[in-house]
Structures are given as structure tokens and as C-alpha cells.
């Protein structure tokens, strides 16, 4: 242990503890702007400086470790003056039009400046302006960049994509797309992790709420919404609702108040995905197609973008099943329209998703032949949903639980856990077991695949009707790259692999609410598993609305019509 004094508090901390960590252990907060534990500890912002007795210069607390006998002052007059000057200089290069920024009220720079009682910026403004195609799902505003390097480090260390890099020198230093590439050709997976780790509004998703408003204003348009599983685990966080209060049924109420005509749960189409993907897996496994390389899940568009750009030779190993979002879009424009006697051209299909890449997925024409067109018309992230609710002046405390609309009311616990890493695989195995044996397994027979082991992915082996099935589950694109390399080198072999681009799965998606310095994917995922545990239906193949859909429209999983509408044509 190391004995130190911080702001007149004498404490002992383990060797190797940083000054910032030592201060936090006795509830002394030190302001910071660029720091992300274990990811970005470079002291670039110099907001976290402290004074050490006997030293002339101030030191950054995020990356300097304590030493025996140190006396540290976190808020001495010298520290206060320096810290305030540093933030004022940062503000001189920052477009501080906070009232029109999506991060207003949830901006680390804004919080630090307010806490330092900065009411004016005494320095000449030198704002960096760079062109960016704001039609792209990911938007970067250079005028709000504070050069913290978080986006670079997250993209490099966690996702392994190296999309961002430093450019320029000295006062002209900035962050941009690496190698001076255009973002549209830079192989970005659109995972959005750079957005959720940015301390300001320099990175954000394209806002599509106006597109929804235009549809709502058109009296001839019928707006049909779907809500993804992971959204229910996070939407209430920035609206002051506890997890117990923030039910998915209250989102239904909010959307109806806004003017949406029909609201459905994407867990329904997650169950539909399981029926199609599970059937495909059983067929490919039985035919020996998986003896050498696995079948990969295809519901995560960030992962699909990744495999297409990084491992194009493996694209044919993807399941042909569309994602739950796109399956529901297809069902809305066909089976739903037919059942409700609605002209499909009048339907505006809205998705509420935890994901930035879903905006890009929507733009891909995934219908074919007589069904050519787009299934989904607009995708809003969880953050956009929250902004939508506030823009309509809806007090979240007044929301009531409202039921989903018919004819697709039911969703199972298996569909709910799609939002957490391992959930798709677990749901698929529950139904694959039934498809192979004609019997249900123990409902939690496959729960060992939840979580991540030291290799960065989880692997397991199951026996089903005398068949040995090897599976793997991975989230985060650097982990995914490591797994793909191991598969290609034949170091490992699996029959079925689930991949999620975002760490922790959709619950940690790039469109989820942002909390400075906190990673909430695990907590949100636990919430989804609780909802599964308490659901009255936990097997996708037992969903009565899924059974009715097949009986009335598709015939059976894997049928010709199902392949036309629910699968990507390879």
C-alpha cells in the first residue's frame, strides 16, 4: 500500500493507483474531458491536472500514479486558474451554440465549463469548419471536436476498425477519417461506438425525426411502428424513469400520443427470424454445409457491414435471413397490408432501434421481384425517441402502459433477449432443439453462452438428438476480428456463430442513451434476461401470432414466399 495525502485526507491505496483513482476512492471528483478508463488515458485535455507539493509543474491525474508520501491538491488556487484557463482555451475553438446541440444537457464540456463557473469566453474564436455529408447515418461536426482522441481509441482498441485518426499539427491539429478517406468509403461499420464515447456533440447520428413528422402530417399515410428489444432496456434513462417504470408498453402510449397509428414489438419479428434462421441452420447442418465453416447470424447490420468489407470471402457463410427489423418491414408492406386491406404504398414503416447501422440497413433495397422496394421507411435511435417524446411535450411520468396492436401482439422471451449478446444464439438453440427433436429443451438449457470469456468470445458444445453442435458468441468488432482469424486459420471450429458489432450486443448499441464514463450494456442485458425469465412464452416456435402468420400467409418456415420476403437473395 502507498500512503498519500489528498486535500488534507490521509489515505493508503494500492501501488499503481492513479491520482484520479485515489481521489475518487474518497469521493473527491476531479474534472476530466478526454479520460476513458483503460481506453484513453493520455492526458490530452489537461483538465484533470492537480498540484503535487514540492513540484513546480502541474500533472495530469488520469495517468500519473501515486508515490509514497505524496501530498496532492486537486483544487488549489494554482490548479483552479490553470484548469479554468485550459477550458476557456478549449471553448475558444468550440462552437458553443449549445441550444441547438443534441448533447446539450448531456455534454461533458458543458458540464465542466458550468462547474468551473465559466460565464464568458475571453479568447478569440477560431472554429474549425469541415464539410460533411449530413445525409450519411453518422454525422461529424468538426466545430464541436475537442481533440480528446476518444473516438480514435475506441475505434482502434475496442472495434479494431481504425476509422479515425489525427490530422494536422500544432493549433491545426484535428481528428478526421484516417488516410484522408471519405467516410462512405472508409469501411466504417456504423456501430456508433465513437458517438456514445464522444464527450460533446462532435459525433452524432443523422436525425430523422422530421421525416417521421412529415409522415404524421400526411392524412393519407398510415404510420406503423416497431420497437426493438434493446430499446426497452434503456429508453427511460434520459427521461428520469427507473427500469421498473420504463416499460415498453409506455413507449406504445408515447407513440400513440405522438400520432402513430399502429405500434408493434420487434420481438415478434425476432421470433420470426428464429423460425427462419433456425430452419436454415438445421438444413445446413444436416446437409453437411457446416462441416468446415460455420453459419453466422445476420441480424446485426454493423457486423454484416464488417464481414462484407473485411472478410468478403466469408459472406456466403452468413444466414440468408433478414434482420428482425427488415422482416417486420416486409411483413408490414405485405401480410399486414393484405390482412388490414391497406394499400402498401400508404404505409410508413417506422423502426425504433438502439442502432446507427440500422439507418443504413433500411436504405438497402431488400425486396425482390414483385415485392421490390424498401420494407422500412424510417429508423430512429433510442436517443431520437427520447428527443421525440420531449419535443412533443410529453411528461414521461404521465405515460401509461398500453397494449401492442393486433394482429402481431405477441412476442416471446426468446425474442426479447435478441438485444443482449448471446441472446440470438440462445433463442435459436431453443427452437433448433425443437425443430430437430420435436420436443422443447429445458428453457435455460443454453444459458451458459451468456457473457464473454477471456478469449473475447464464448464457446460451447451441445448434444441435440445425438448431434454435437459447436457454437460461439462474440460481441465487439476487435473480438470478432480475432475470432474470424482463428476460424480462417482452422484454430477453432464451430457450426453456428452469433456476432454483434457492439460490445454487449444491441443493449450497448451506438444509438442508446449516453452516460459519461459508464458502460451499461451488462445492466441493460440483465434486464432483458429478467424479462425473458418472467415471460409467459419463452420459445419462438410457441408464439401463436407467428403460427397464424405462417398458416395464413407464408405456409411454413423456409417456404418459397418466406424466401422471397424474409431472406436476402444471395
Regions found by a protein language model. Give the residues of each.
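Eukaryote-biased recognition of intrinsically disordered, low-complexity regulatory segments
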Residues: 1-9
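Short glycine-rich or small-residue beta-strand-to-loop segments that form or flank ligand, phosphate
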Residues: 7, 138-141, 226, 499-500
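Mobile "lid/hinge" segments at catalytic clefts and subdomain interfaces of large enzymes
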Residues: 162, 195, 385-389
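A generic beta-sheet turn/junction motif
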Residues: 6, 168, 464-466
Amino acid at each position: 500500500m502507498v500512503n498519500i495525502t489528498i486535500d488534507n485526507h490521509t489515505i493508503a491505496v494500492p501501488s499503481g493507483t492513479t491520482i484520479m483513482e485515489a481521489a475518487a476512492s474518497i469521493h473527491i471528483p476531479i474534472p476530466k474531458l478526454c479520460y476513458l478508463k483503460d481506453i484513453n488515458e493520455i492526458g490530452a485535455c489537461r483538465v484533470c491536472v492537480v498540484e503535487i507539493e514540492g513540484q513546480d509543474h502541474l500533472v495530469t491525474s488520469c495517468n500519473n500514479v501515486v508515490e509514497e508520501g505524496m501530498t496532492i491538491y486537486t483544487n488549489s488556487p494554482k490548479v483552479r486558474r490553470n484548469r479554468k484557463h485550459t477550458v476557456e482555451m478549449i471553448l475558444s475553438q468550440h462552437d458553443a451554440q449549445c441550444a441547438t446541440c443534441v448533447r446539450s444537457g448531456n455534454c461533458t464540456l458543458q458540464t465542466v465549463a458550468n462547474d468551473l463557473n465559466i460565464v464568458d469566453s475571453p479568447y478569440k474564436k477560431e472554429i474549425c469548419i469541415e464539410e460533411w455529408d449530413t445525409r450519411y447515418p453518422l454525422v461529424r461536426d468538426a466545430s464541436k471536436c475537442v481533440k480528446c482522441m476518444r473516438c480514435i481509441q475506441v475505434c482502434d482498441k475496442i472495434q479494431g476498425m481504425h476509422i479515425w485518426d489525427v490530422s494536422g499539427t500544432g493549433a491545426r491539429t484535428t481528428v478526421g477519417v484516417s488516410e484522408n478517406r471519405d467516410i462512405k468509403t472508409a469501411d466504417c461499420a456504423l456501430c456508433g461506438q465513437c458517438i456514445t464515447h464522444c464527450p460533446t456533440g462532435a459525433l452524432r447520428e443523422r436525425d430523422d425525426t422530421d421525416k417521421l413528422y412529415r409522415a404524421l402530417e400526411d392524412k393519407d399515410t398510415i404510420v406503423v411502428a416497431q420497437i426493438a428489444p434493446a430499446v426497452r432496456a434503456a429508453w427511460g434513462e434520459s427521461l428520469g424513469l427507473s427500469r421498473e417504470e420504463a416499460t415498453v408498453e409506455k413507449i406504445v402510449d408515447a407513440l400513440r400520443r405522438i400520432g402513430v397509428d399502429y405500434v408493434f414489438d420487434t420481438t415478434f419479428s425476432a421470433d420470426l427470424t428464429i423460425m427462419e434462421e433456425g430452419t436454415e441452420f438445421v438444413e445446413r447442418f444436416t446437409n453437411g454445409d457446416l462441416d468446415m465453416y460455420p453459419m453466422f447470424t445476420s441480424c446485426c447490420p454493423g457486423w454484416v457491414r464488417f464481414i462484407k468489407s473485411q472478410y468478403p470471402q466469408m459472406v456466403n457463410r452468413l444466414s440468408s435471413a433478414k434482420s428482425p427489423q427488415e422482416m417486420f418491414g416486409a411483413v408490414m408492406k405485405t401480410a399486414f397490408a393484405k390482412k388490414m386491406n391497406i394499400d402498401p404504398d400508404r404505409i410508413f414503416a417506422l423502426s425504433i432501434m438502439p442502432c446507427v447501422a440500422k439507418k443504413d440497413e433500411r436504405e438497402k433495397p431488400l425486396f425482390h421481384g414483385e415485392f421490390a422496394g424498401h420494407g422500412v421507411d424510417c429508423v430512429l435511435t433510442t436517443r431520437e425517441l427520447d428527443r421525440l417524446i420531449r419535443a412533443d411535450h410529453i411528461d414521461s411520468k404521465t405515460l401509461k402502459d398500453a397494449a401492442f396492436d393486433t394482429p402481431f401482439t405477441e412476442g416471446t422471451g426468446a425474442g426479447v433477449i435478441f438485444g443482449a449478446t448471446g441472446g440470438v444464439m440462445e433463442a435459436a438453440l431453443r427452437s433448433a432443439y425443437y425443430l430437430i427433436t420435436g420436443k422443447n429443451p429445458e428453457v435455460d438449457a443454453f444459458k451458459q453462452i451468456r457473457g464473454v470469456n477471456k478469449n473475447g468470445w464464448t464457446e460451447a458444445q451441445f448434444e441435440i438428438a445425438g448431434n454435437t453442435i459447436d457454437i460461439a458468441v462474440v460481441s465487439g468488432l476487435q473480438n470478432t476480428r480475432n475470432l474470424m482469424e482463428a476460424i480462417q486459420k482452422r484454430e477453432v471450429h464451430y457450426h453456428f456463430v452469433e456476432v454483434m458489432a457492439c460490445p454487449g450486443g444491441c443493449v450497448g448499441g451506438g444509438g442508446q442513451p449516453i452516460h459519461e464514463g459508464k458502460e451499461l450494456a451488462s445492466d441493460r442485458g440483465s434486464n432483458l434476461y429478467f424479462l425473458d425469465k418472467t415471460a409467459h412464452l419463452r420459445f419462438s416456435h410457441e408464439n401463436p401470432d407467428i403460427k397464424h402468420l405462417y398458416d395464413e400467409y407464408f405456409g411454413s418456415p423456409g417456404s418459397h414466399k418466406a424466401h422471397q420476403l424474409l431472406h436476402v437473395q444471395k
